[in-house]
Structures are given as C-alpha cells and as structure tokens.
From Swiss-Prot:
Is a potent antagonist of neurogenic gene activity during sensory organ development. The expression of distinct cell fates by the trichogen (shaft) / tormogen (socket) sister cell pair depends on the level of H activity. A certain threshold level of H activity is required, below which both sister cells adopt the tormogen fate. GO terms for cellular component: RNA polymerase II transcription repressor complex. Residues 14-75, 97-141, 269-322, 340-368, 408-504, 533-876, 976-1077 are annotated as: Disordered. Residues 408-439, 449-459 have a biased composition (Basic and acidic residues). This is Protein hairless. One of its GO terms (biological process) is somatic stem cell population maintenance. Residues 704-713, 772-782, 837-846, 1056-1070 have a biased composition (Polar residues). Residues 596-607 have a biased composition (Gly residues). It is found in: Nucleus. Signal peptide: none annotated. Keywords: Developmental protein, DNA-binding, Nucleus, Phosphoprotein. Residues 984-995 have a biased composition (Basic residues).
Length: 1077
C-alpha cells in the first residue's frame, strides 16, 4: 500500500490543519483526501485510499495523539475521516493523548514490496504512520469498517506521528513492506501496530483498510475492522519493533477518548513467531524485521519487552524462561517463632504428604496445628529475638496483628487517634502511644518520646517504660506473647488485652521496621527527647516531643501512609505517594477538623489532635498524622514562646500544619509539595529524621529552620529539600525524597524554585553567615546548611542531635511558621500553595533574613518580624503571642482549607483578626522600616485573607477573595483595624485572582511577618520573642491603620514593593518566588 502516500498525506494534513481540531482534521482529511493524495503524489490512489481510509480515520483519531487528525488524507477516507472525526469528537479524542513522537527521519531502504509510490518522499510528519486495519494493513475493508479501523488507526497514525515515518504493519510477524514503501521515501517504517487488546481495531500503520487482505498479511484480528477502535480495547503502537505507546479507551467521563496506558507487556495474540521475543539489539536499522540479525526492534530501554507483536525480529531469541519460576513465585509462611508444630500436626502432615487426598479424621482435623511454643516462657529476651525474627518472618501477619492490636488497644486509646493510626499502617503503634499518652499523662513528656518511638510500637512501649532499644523487646514481646503483652501493657500503664502472639509478632515486625529510623533517632535524640519532655512545656514539650516523636514517629507517626511517603518516598512512585498523601489528608483532615480545632484551641499543642491533646495524645496523634506533628511542633513552640494567645493561633496554624500533612500531598503534587510533604514530614519527620537519613531530609529543613532559629531556617531552606521551607532547599538538598518531588513539582508550585532561590538567597546570606542575627545558631547552621542542601541529613548533624532537638523545640514555631505555612500554603490549594509557598519562601527568607539580617527590618514583612526578632520593642506579650500566632495562622491558614470549610472559616475569622493583628504587628515594624511596610502589613493582612481565601479552592464558601476579605474585615474590625480589612479584601480578592505576583508578594510579606515572629519564638529567643512579638503587635495596631491605608491604596504595589524589598533582603528568594508563580 502506499504508506508513503499516506505519510505524505498525513504530513500534508498536518501541514494543513496541524490537527488543532478533530473537526478541522476531518475536514482536512475529507477535503484533503485528494489533495493529500496529490500531495502524496501517491501513484496508487486505491492503495492510498485504502491506506488513507485507515490513515484518515487513524489520523482523525490521532487528533488526540497529535495533530494527526488532519493526517487522514484518503479520498475514500473522507467519509471515514468524517466518521472518525465525529467519533473522536464524541469520544473526546481530540488531543486526548497528544503524544506525537518526533518523526524518525532515518530512511528505510525501500524494500517495500508494496510501496507503489516510493516516488513521493513523505515528509516524515509527526503523524506519518498511515492507519491500517491492524491485521489487514493492505486488506481493503469497507469504508465503514475503515472508519472504525480509522478510529483505531488514528492511534496508529499517532504512532506514525510519533514515528513520523511510514509505519510498517507487521501482522503475524510479517512486515508490511507496503508500509515500508513510505520508508523508501526516507522515513523509517514505523510499525504502528495498534494492538487492540479488547477488540479494538488493530491498525498497522501502512496498512490499508481495504476489504482484501494483503499478501503476507494474516487478518490477525479483523474484528478491528468491524469494531470501532473506541470500544473497549487498547491501541498499542510499535515502531521499529519497539513498543512506543499504548492507548486504552478512556472511561466514561474522561476528557479524552483515549488515555495512554502505562506500558504493559500485553501482547495480543498474533502470528508473530514468538510473543516472548525480547529484542536486545540497540541497533536501529532499516532492514526488514528478519533481515537484521540484531533485530529491528531495538531498544536500550525496557520497551523492548513491548516489542511489536507484529514485528518480532528475532523469534529465535526467546526471553530466557525463568528457571525456578514456580519457586520464585511461591509464598512462604514462616510460623511465628513462638508457635511450633505439634507432634500430632507433624504426623498429620506427613500422612497428608503421602496420601494427599485421604480425608483427615475428625480428631486430626480438630487438632490445633500449632502448639504454643514454650519459648514464650523464655521471657522478653528470647521473645524479643524471636520477635525480631518474626518481624522478618511474619510481615504478612503484621496487618492482621496490627488490626488486632489496634482493636485490643483501641478501648484504651483515643478512638480518633486510633482510627487515624489504624488508617495508617502504624495504627497499633499509635494506639500504644495513645494509651501510653493517656496513662503517661503524668509523664506526658515521656509520651512524646513514645511518640517518637511511636514509629515503632516497640518504640512506644519503650517510651512508656524507658527510652531504650529495650522498648523493642516489650513491643516484640507484646506482639509475640500475650503474657509479654500484658507485661508491656502494665509497663506502659495500658494493658493490652490478649493480643494474639502472632498478631503481636506481625505488629512488632511492623513496628520494628518502622522503629529502625525512629530508634536511630531515639538513640541519637533520647536525651533530647527527654529534655523536650522535661521541658514539659506543652508547646515546647509538645513541640519538641512532637519533633522527636515526629522524628521517631515520622515513619510510624506518618503511619504506614506517612511512613511510605516519607520513608519510602525515595522508593515509592509519586503517584503512590500522592495517593498515600491523600489518604493521609482524609485521615488527618478529620484529625485536623476534630483534633486540629480542639488542639488549636486547647493547646497550641497542635492543630492536629496530637498537639491538641498535649504531649500525651500528641504523640499518638502525631503518629497518626506526622504532618500534623511537625507543624504542631512549630506551633506549640511558638505558643510557649509567645503566650497562650499565640497558642491558639499556633494551634490553628498547627491545624493547617496538619494540613501540611495534607499538604504532604500537595507537596507531593507540587514543587513545594515535596516541601509540603516534607514540611509535614519535615515538620513531623524532620525532627525524627535527623537520626534517620530518610526522614532527616524532611527533618532537616525543619530542624535547621527550627534549630538555629535563624540559621536553622536558612539551613532548612538550604539543607532541607523536604521542608516546606526547603522548597528552595529542594534545590539545595535534592537528596531528600520529598525533595525530588519538590523539585518535580516545584515548577507547578514554583515553590521549589522560590525555595531554591530562597535557598540560594539564604545561601548567599548564610554564606555571609555573619549576618544571621541569631548568633551561633545561624552561623552554625549556615555553613552546614550549605552542605546540607546536598545532604540534608548532614545539616541536622550540624548541631548535636540533642541540641538540634532542643533547638527544634524552640525553633518549632518558626519551623512551623515557615515550614508549615509552606506546606499549608502549598497544600491549601495549588494557587494557595503557590501563594503560600511563596509566602513560606518569603517567610523562610524572612526568618533567614531576620536571622541573617535580623536587626535590619529591611524585609518588608520580614523586616517587621525581623525587627521584633532582633530588636523588637516589647509590648504586650499576649499581643506578641497573638501576632506570632497570627503569623503562624497566616502561614497555616491555607491549611484550614484542608480543614473543613467551617474550620477554615473559623480559622479565617480567628486568624483574620489575628492576622490583622499580626499583620498590624508585622506591619508596624515593616512600616517603620519601609514606607511600604504599611502596605506590607496590609498585604500581610491581605495575605492572611488570601491564605484564607485560597482555602476557597478547597471550600468554596466565603473563602474567596470576597469571603476572605469579609473575614479579614471582620477580623480587622474586631481588632479595630478597618483599613487592613479593606486592604485585605482587595488583596484577598487579588491573591485569589492573581495569586502569583501581588498575592505572592502579599503572602510573602505576611509570611515574612508571621514567620519572623514565629521564628523568633521558635528560637531560643522564644521568650524574648514573646515580648518582641508583643512589641510588634503593639506597633501593629498603629501600623495597622497606616498599613491598611497604605495597603489598600497600594496593596498590589506594596506587595510588589515588598517583593522588591524582599528581593533586596532575599533577593533570590522572593524574586524567584514571584518568578515561580
């Protein structure tokens, strides 16, 4: 068949219509049939036409894949093209899979048995493959069937488009040389074999959809001709024997008719000599399939496995059958170490082996297979060893065991925590932690440790009893032995009710696995954890303990989902991570709404329930939602640092931090998302990650952020790819698993880049480590952070883990503020995230700047925070706390979006006043440093509102610009700042509408304002920061009016100005942030 003509016509069609429209394409194919043929200069019009039939329909279908709809260029295929176009339009094929591969220019020697018109050199258009009825490429089919084939062929033409050369249809392993005919024109034959698995028309690229079969062609699946390509099937495209694309019919409601399928080794039944042929040759030659000893189907990648069924180059080259496949696939059951087969069971088994079909006697049947091992009597040590083995042996049992344990513990534990934990793989651990928390409420500080250890039930047990690897034993014992379990319960203070040893073992295994990083962290940070617990400040204790628990907990705290996301981020596909994050979001959303609000009001311990419940619950909650934990860390810290008033905002913030958890998803999704995820992980796990390299990535950003307060912050930015802060850090620390995600997503969220900028900026400022206002901390973190970006794990190590832990305690607020906001920001919604991310970047930048340039309140939003930080006039500590809380809330308000709408509203109302207040606070210092700071304060308020409004993305109630503005106005009115309210309103509306520049700027400024405060509180200066913040707050009120007026008038400009000002301070960070968006 005249594939060449087809290709040419396709090229022509492409030229004509670029396939913008299936309709257009159809028209082109219809009107261009002859013109295409003419263009093709095809000598055989019939062949061309039949080819074109397939091609035209194929081309029209290719609309989805590329601009190949226009490829349909057959005279006869005009009808088909129209039908195909209609079909495509109906199915939304238009560009559904617009994957047009670059044409393969290498000309194939024209051994085109069929190419009647090699004369025309087809321009290898992206859609050069002519659609052929897959199996009868040359067989001419009725046009109606051609149309059907055409729809299938469209996919083929897509392949052709990808091949952009005549495609060879190899059916039954026979090359379609007519297809190759086009190759003579200098295009490589593209075997665009559309293998329609489910009765989809299989269209070979140069195959005519004629009724008569071609010589060598076996109608492998003529059904393709009769059935519409659109109905239940898959189109597989092969080029040069290499699988290039597979399209499956999209499910109803999909935008496009065809969706690309991840490559599967689906080989439709074919006459191909060997379906298992695995072409290994990397030689791409234009020889016909069997002429090349190295095989035409070449691929260095694994696509060779998908070698075209039609074109198997080396049938003799069988993929080596796996020798022991039956053994490889066998599943082994390793009995629990503590159960042994009884003699009777062994006898029965031996008899069954000899006479498998002989029925068992009832006595035998009733006999227990396992005799309880006496080993259980050996005590914890033996059990522990056995448990460890069981961990390896009985992972399968883990799920059941975990469930059992959870159920057993559930009564003792907080249901919500239990549920959340149960939802995640570490429910039991969480439960243990919860029970421990409840029982250890006297020793809540210990509880955070358990939470750290929550990663591991053992860890939990341990924390209850002791912070030692011994906890593993109790946990293992717990899992292994009911008796041991009881002992554990007693030690934990919570009796575990008759856990099945097996279940216990599995749970222990899980916990042990989970606790490895936690244990490392625990060992490294036990003293820190103890110190945190000793700090006993709910916020500090909660924050630190959460930090530690997060550290330990990240795997377990995050729960299975979190663990997988955080721990295995490196190994888990982004999609899975996102899914897991979504699970977490749903789980933690509930926690957020329930615990978050409760926690927010209750403690500042954490928007998340873990924080809310204080240390006792917080550790389990943290476990349940590591994201929650980390942000709460920051939040609680600010709370203690600032004051109660700060606490509730901090808590609110924390809830968003929880949202961070959700934002983990966002972080996964967006560049910031890596940060977001990391921020949740980073917040939650960062602390825990210090010891654990994986977690450390996440951990570091926050840790660095938290630890040096200022230095930490920049360090986090630089060091921690995972930290929301470290979105930029992503650039700095690409090693973080999240970091990768962040980088990946950074473009979407442009958080990564901003962070990167921030990172570089931080780097620069940090490079000038002399700048960091926070003395040693900043400096210390500075240099390591530099390294840290490369190795986030290193960054935390900059400071002794204990120190880091403590610092985290204090830095938690800043970390929360910067880290959580970023996750929150990212998470709140993609736009929000961008705002937020930018804001967090600015925040980060600002905290860094505060640290780096703390005395200079240069940074607009930052400057104000910075000035409070470095030289804040002390005012009302409660006001300062409120400001800090507001800042935190501002950072986290986007989180509320993940909260429920009502929570968001609450957050907006609560935070808006706080925001207003906070922004006033921030703004007044800002105002003093900058004329724009007033605008910055207004922008901050607007950013707060915008943050609230971004939530509109999630809940469409009054969090839109107007709703946010109203909330902001109400808040402002509550705070007696009418002007900021209006400013907020414009900003709110504006950020929503223009989240990128002005909104970002606004967010950035507010974030900076908020972050510096939070950062201040987060640092050791936390107490001082209280006064600073209060100082900020008190000026804020005055500043608020100025700022409101300034902001209202120049919200955008002020935001932009802030951006410039931030640019000055965080030149890389903010501008990049803006550029990001």
């Amino acid at each position: 068949m005249a594939l060449l003509n087809d290709v040419t016509s396709v090229a022509e069609c492409n030229r004509q219509t670029t396939m913008t429209d299936e309709h257009k394409s159809n028209i082109n194919s219809n009107s261009s049939h002859s013109s295409n043929n003419n263009n093709n200069g095809s000598s055989s019009n019939n062949d061309n036409n039949s080819n074109d039939d397939a091609a035209s329909s194929s081309n029209s279908k290719n609309n989805n894949t590329s601009n190949e709809s226009s490829h349909s260029n057959n005279n006869t295929s005009s009808i088909i093209a129209e039908a195909a176009a209609k079909f495509l339009l109906k199915n939304g094929l238009n560009g559904s899979s617009s994957t047009s591969y670059p044409p393969l220019p290498p000309p194939l020697p024209a051994n085109l048995s069929r190419t009647t018109t090699p004369t025309t050199t087809t321009t290898p258009s992206s859609s050069s493959s002519t659609a052929s009825n897959g199996f009868l490429p040359h067989a001419k089919t009725p046009k109606s069937s051609s149309i059907m084939a055409a729809s299938a062929a469209v996919a083929a033409s897509v392949v052709g488009a990808t091949a952009s050369k005549p495609t060879i249809d190899v059916l039954g392993g026979v090359l379609d040389y007519s297809s190759l005919g086009g190759a003579a024109t200098g295009s490589l034959p593209t075997t665009a074999v559309v293998a329609a698995a489910a009765g989809t028309a299989k269209i070979g690229k140069g195959s005519n959809s004629g009724g008569s079969f071609d010589m060598g062609r076996t109608p492998i699946s003529t059904h393709g001709n009769n059935s519409w390509g659109g109905y239940g099937g898959r189109l597989q495209f092969f080029k040069d024997g290499k699988f290039i694309l597979e399209l499956a019919r999209s499910k109803d409601g999909d935008k496009s008719g065809w969706v690309s399928v991840t490559r599967k080794t689906f080989r439709p039944p074919s006459a191909a000599t060997s379906a298992t042929v695995t072409p290994t040759s990397a030689v791409t030659t234009a020889y016909p399939k069997n002429e090349n000893s190295t095989s035409l189907s070449f691929s260095d990648d694994n696509s060779s496995i998908q070698s075209s069924p039609w074109q198997r180059d080396q049938p003799w080259k069988q993929s080596r059958p796996r020798r022991g496949i039956s053994k490889e696939l066998s599943l082994f059951f390793h009995r629990p170490r503590n159960s042994t087969l009884g003699r009777a069971a062994l006898r029965t088994a031996a008899r069954k082996r000899r006479r498998p079909h002989e029925p068992l006697t009832t006595s035998e049947d009733q006999q227990p297979i396992f005799a309880t091992a006496i080993k259980a009597e050996n005590g914890d040590d033996t059990l522990k060893a056995e448990a460890a083995e069981a961990v390896e042996i009985e992972n399968v049992a883990v799920a059941d065991t975990t469930t059992n344990e959870i159920k057993i513990e559930k009564p003792d534990t907080i249901k919500g925590e239990d549920d959340a934990e149960r939802l995640e793989k570490e429910p039991k651990k969480a439960v243990s932690d919860d029970s421990e928390s409840k029982e250890a409420s006297p020793g809540q500080q210990v509880e955070p440790q358990p939470k750290d250890e929550t990663v591991d039930v053992e860890m939990k047990m341990n924390t209850s009893e002791d912070e030692e690897p011994m906890t593993e034993l109790p946990r293992i014992t717990n899992a292994v032995n009911g008796d041991l379990n009881g002992d554990l319960k007693a030690s934990i203070g919570k009796p575990k009710s008759k856990p099945k040893p097996k279940a216990k073992l599995s749970s222990i295994i899980q916990k042990l696995i989970d606790s490895v990083p936690a244990r490392l962290e625990q060992m490294s940070k036990t003293s820190a954890v103890i110190a945190s617990t000793t700090t006993s400040s709910d916020r500090i204790g909660g924050g630190l303990s959460h930090a530690l628990t997060h550290k330990v907990s990240p795997p377990s705290s995050a729960t299975a989902a979190g663990r997988l996301v955080e721990y295995h981020t490196q190994h888990v596909s982004p999609r899975k991570r996102i899914l897991r994050e979504f699970e977490k979001v749903s789980l933690e959303d509930n926690g957020c709404v329930n615990n978050g609000s409760g926690g927010a009001s209750s403690g500042g311990a954490g928007g998340k329930r873990s924080r809310a419940k204080g240390t006792s619950t917080s550790s389990p909650a943290g476990k349940a939602s590591p994201m929650n934990l980390a942000p709460p860390q920051g939040k609680p810290s600010p709370s203690p640092g600032s004051s109660s008033s700060s606490t509730s905002p901090a808590t609110l913030s924390t809830q968003p931090t929880r949202l961070n958890s959700s934002y983990s998803i966002h972080s996964l999704l967006g560049g910031s998302s890596g940060s977001g995820s990391s921020s949740f992980s980073s917040s939650g796990k960062k602390c825990g990650d210090h010891p654990a390299a994986i977690i450390s990535n996440v951990h570091h950003p926050q840790h660095s952020m938290y630890q040096p307060s200022s230095s930490s912050y920049p360090r986090a930015l630089l060091t921690s790819p995972k930290s929301p802060d470290v979105s930029g850090s992503n650039g700095g620390g690409g090693k973080s698993p999240s970091h990768t995600g962040t980088k990946k997503r950074s473009p979407p969220y442009s958080a990564g880049s901003p962070v990167d900028y921030g990172h570089s900026f931080y780097r620069d400022p940090y490079a000038g480590a002399g700048r960091p206002s926070t003395s040693g901390s900043a400096s210390q973190d500075l240099s390591p952070p530099r390294s840290s970006p490369a190795s986030p794990a290193t960054t935390p190590r900059t400071v002794p883990k204990k120190t880091a832990s403590i610092r985290r305690e204090f830095a938690s607020p800043s970390a929360s503020s910067s880290s959580c906001p970023s996750p929150g920001d990212r998470s709140a919604s993609p736009p929000e995230r961008r705002h937020m991310q930018q804001q967090p970047h600015l925040q980060r930048s600002s905290p860094l700047h505060y640290y780096m340039y703390p005395p200079p309140p240069q940074v607009n939003g930052n400057g104000s925070a910075g000035s409070p930080t470095s030289a804040p006039p002390t005012s009302n500590s409660s006001a300062a706390a409120v400001a800090a809380a507001a800042a935190a809330a501002a950072a986290y308000i986007p989180s509320p979006s993940i909260y429920n709408p009502y929570i968001s509203t609450l957050a907006a109302l609560r935070h808006n006043p706080l925001w207003m207040h906070h922004y006033q606070t921030g703004a007044s210092p800002l105002l003093s440093p900058h004329p724009q700071p007033g605008g910055s304060a207004a922008a901050a308020a607007a950013a707060a509102a915008a943050r609230l409004s971004p939530q509109s993305a999630y809940h469409a109630f009054a969090y839109n610009g107007v709703g946010a503005a109203v909330a902001a106005a109400a808040a402002a009115a509550a705070f007696g700042q009418p002007a900021p309210s209006p400013h907020t309103h414009p900003h709110l509306a504006h950020p929503h509408q223009h989240p990128h520049p002005a909104a970002l700027t606004t967010h950035h400024s507010p974030a900076h304002l908020a972050t510096p405060k939070l950062t201040d509180s987060s640092t050791d200066q936390m107490s001082a920061t209280s006064s600073h913040r209060t100082a900020s707050t008190s000026p804020s009120s005055s500043s608020a009016s100025a700022s409101s007026s300034a902001a209202t008038s120049g919200a955008s400009s002020s935001a932009m100005f802030h951006t410039s000002s931030l640019r000055n301070e965080q030149s890389s960070d903010l501008p990049l942030n803006l550029s990001k968006h």
